[in-house]
Amino acid sequence: MAVQQNKPTRSKRGMRRSHDALTAVTSLSVDQTSGEKHLRHHITADGFYRGRKVITK
């Protein structure tokens, strides 16, 4: 089993964790038909995708 030789510093710990932060969703699209905002390449809550109804409830 590997055992560290020296204690990692706060700086090294911070550098390792620098990519762990969550980013805000910035790329929201507007549906052509309903005008509703949605994630890119996802359907809207109404069931529309690229202006067409793809899911019926």
From Swiss-Prot:
Ranges where the record places region Disordered: 1-38
One matching Pfam family: Ribosomal_L32p
Alphabetized InterPro entries for the sequence: Ribosomal_bL32 (IPR002677), Ribosomal_bL32_bact (IPR044957), Ribosomal_zn-bd (IPR011332)
Keyword check for Acyltransferase: no
A GO biological-process term: translation
Alphabetical keyword list: Ribonucleoprotein, Ribosomal protein
Compositional bias annotation for Polar residues: 24-33
HAMAP family with a match to the protein in the record: Ribosomal_bL32
Entry's family note: Belongs to the bacterial ribosomal protein bL32 family.
Name used for this protein in its record: Large ribosomal subunit protein bL32
Source organism of the structure: Enterobacter sp. (strain 638)
